[in-house]
Amino acid sequence: MLFLVISQTTSFMITVRQFTFTIFKFQFMATSNVSSRVNELLEAVKKEFEDICQKTKTVEAQKDDFEYKAMISAQINEMALMKQTVMDLEMQQSKVKDRYEEEITSLKAQLEARRKEIASGVVPQSSKTKHGRNSVSFGKYGNAGPFNSDNSSKPLILNNGSSGGTPKNLRSPAIDSDGTVLAPIQTSNVDLGSQYYSSPHVRPAVGATMAGSAMRTFPSNLPLGHPPPPSDSANSSVTPIAAPLVVNGKVSGNPPYPAEIIPTSNVPNREEKDWTVTSNVPNKEPPISVQLLHTLEHTSVICYVRFSADGKFLATGCNRAAMVFNVETGKLITLLQEESSKREGDLYVRSVAFSPDGKYLATGVEDQQIRIWDIAQKRVYRLLTGHEQEIYSLDFSKDGKTLVSGSGDRTVCLWDVEAGEQKLILHTDDGVTTVMFSPDGQFIAAGSLDKVIRIWTSSGTLVEQLHGHEESVYSVAFSPDGKYLVSGSLDNTIKLWELQCVSNVAPSMYKEGGICKQTFTGHKDFILSVTVSPDGKWIISGSKDRTIQFWSPDSPHSQLTLQGHNNSVISVAVSPNGHCFATGSGDLRARIWSYEDL
């Protein structure tokens, strides 16, 4: 019995052990299967992630390629549009060119017909010049305006001698592009002079010289002006200015009259074919008789006009050339053309100056070089180099041995003419627009873009600075006795200065900023040029408002207005003989005028 119990117990224990082993085996197998499945799932996820990354890279590459192709396509379309636009413009330009060529041919035919009529003794009615004085309403010019008198005299719009528009993109200061310009007359049967020269059919006689008239000097009892405080800096540097002189703005229509004049029906004007003289003194005749002597046609803008010391010749500066005319006849004597410069495009002669003996003509050009020409030989006698910007102004000393130049590089240079070398360099704070020797050659005046006028001795000592203008100073001129200085500015005013450096006053007693004796107002736009008559009686100014005005040193108001150009009056010069003056303009014309006191 006991054995049976033991046997059953043993059998039960064996059964339990087998059952336990079976359970452990099953658990082990289950754990192994789960681990394997997890690994498989992880591998699948990893593979899927890698596939997605690869597809993303492929899509991004395709996107970049698509955007690049789209950009190229847009640029191709834009280029095609630009090409079509250029072709359209070329077609329009060709049509305009053909039309202008037809007009030029027609005008040449009309001109030739008129010449034949004149040669045969038949003068067309429209070519007769009006004479006498006409009393017309102030500010009125008849039916056609001051610059258009008949259909045959309508000017042709040209661009530096070629068809297609008015002169644009010129470096010369204060040149409008809105005014109509006259075409130079060029035919196969004219000489060199007639390409640039034209005179009225009937020329008034040259006025008598001023030698016999009462000499009048600048008064010393003029009311003292009140210039504003001096500019910030008195010292200067040599740093060149970044840009050449450029005058902005436009003048539309005919220039207005001075503000102080009230239009009345009984104020006399003298009206000619294309120029008018207006008295600015109410109810009085013009105090000066002005007559047009010669019209000198050019193929480009005239930047400068200058008389020789004997008054027999007039020099003009224009694009790539300086011209010398006979004042009495108006004929072109010499054409000094710049061909050696390597610079392409426009190359304007900004300033000209005769030597006192009339043998040489100095020219200041945009290529930063000064050429002293032997006029008779038509060759460059001296080439002066050293400026780093364009040259805007030149003047010879009284003895002709020294030349002074002003440049945009902020320097005034004195040159030994015989040696062709720099003698002295004077520095300013900004570009120098105008320079001039005093009549005795002891002082040099210079106007600048920094609104200041500086006076040096001929040895280079700065003795005086004149402050008062509110904008750049573009022109200066000494009085005949050298005691006064006239300045013209872009602030539309002219100022008369009493020079302390020529007086017996000690430098320590100088009034700071200078002594302004008079401020002249009346011009409606920039003052581009001023000059003083040899007897000191008249100040003559040229302006961007297209007028020339006469001023008496005694009065701040203009005495007379001359309208003789249909673009900016860039330069004015008076003859040393005192009986005539010259003007140069953006309308491609220089004119010589006579004047005489009434």
UniProtKB/Swiss-Prot annotation:
InterPro entries: G-protein_beta_WD-40_rep, Gprotein_B, Tscrpt_rep_Tup1_N, WD40/YVTN_repeat-like_dom_sf, WD40_repeat_CS, WD40_repeat_dom_sf, WD40_rpt. GO terms for biological process: negative regulation of transcription by RNA polymerase II. GO terms for molecular function: histone binding; transcription corepressor activity. Residues 118-177 are annotated as: Disordered. WD repeats lie at residues 285-325, 332-371, 374-413, 415-454, 456-495, 510-549, 552-585. It comes from the Eukaryota. GO terms for cellular component: chromatin; Cyc8(Ssn6)-Tup1 general repressor complex; cytoplasm; cytosol; nucleus. The keyword Transport does not apply. Keywords: Repeat, Repressor, Transcription, Transcription regulation, WD repeat. Gene3D superfamilies: 1.20.5.340, YVTN repeat-like/Quinoprotein amine dehydrogenase. Belongs to the WD repeat TUP1 family. Transcriptional repressor. This is Transcriptional repressor tup12. It comes from Schizosaccharomyces pombe (strain 972 / ATCC 24843).
